[in-house]
């Protein structure tokens, strides 16, 4: 590898919008602000919403279901 072409890989203080703070390593700089982390993301907290797509599927079948049948 060539010398002096790679960015510095430093410790970064990450702050989430929920207030959680942790430290990781990155080439971005010394501080990083993020919107979601493992403490506030719905997948990890178990508070995720399940979207009901059954109505959309039924509406599609009602509108276009007749095109698959032969007369």
UniProtKB/Swiss-Prot annotation:
Pfam families: Ribosomal_L31. GO terms for cellular component: ribonucleoprotein complex; ribosome. One of its GO terms (biological process) is translation. It comes from the Bacteria. The keyword Ribonucleoprotein applies. Coiled coil: none annotated. Its cofactor is Zn(2+). InterPro entries: Ribosomal_bL28/bL31-like_sf (IPR034704), Ribosomal_bL31 (IPR002150), Ribosomal_bL31_A (IPR027491), Ribosomal_bL31_sf (IPR042105). Zn(2+) binds at residues 16, 18, 37, 40. Signal peptide: none annotated. Binds 1 zinc ion per subunit. Part of the 50S ribosomal subunit. Binds the 23S rRNA. This is Large ribosomal subunit protein bL31.
